[in-house]
Amino acid sequence: MADPSFDIVSKVDTQEIDNAVNQTAKEIKTRFDFRDTGASAALSGESILLQANSEDRVKAVLDVLQEKFVKRGISLKSLEHGEPRQSGKEYKLTVTVQQGIADEKAKAIAKKIRADGPKGVQAQIQGDQLRVTGKKRDDLQRVIQLLKAEDFDVPLQFVNYR
């Protein structure tokens, strides 16, 4: 029988992202403080474009978007954005949704597992995810607890536990 293993991934459900953006756009249309500000939120691929006619209104739209993400159970760690930039009379802010674990984060997670994890547990980087194998299921449970206690600035999910 093969050794027990599980995968560490960082994925966000695209349907939930779409729902959160649609709820944000709907709330912007109905809220009085956004009236006549040209505020909008639109999803295009893996990024969300927020627009309004002032910098503080764009930041307010971002707050509404973050509130909707939290309500839909999406971690805010998966969002990456800069400062609003002016484009003509409008301010725009591009919010990128991170999918997968970046190489440097994957190396940091693997290093943490080797340093502080139980003996005999191995972590292999496979593209944008990690595969963790060990001799005992209890060791894998300890690795999961270790990683949940640590903050790697990416939302981690543990899947394919065998």
UniProtKB/Swiss-Prot annotation:
One of its GO terms (molecular function) is nucleotide binding. Signal peptide: none annotated. Keywords: Nucleotide-binding. GO terms for cellular component: cytosol. It holds the Pfam family DUF520. NCBIfam families: PRK05412.1. Nucleotide-binding protein. PANTHER family: UPF0234 PROTEIN YAJQ. Belongs to the YajQ family. This is Nucleotide-binding protein Franean1_6074. It comes from Parafrankia sp. (strain EAN1pec). The lineage of its organism: Bacteria, Bacillati, Actinomycetota, Actinomycetes, Frankiales.
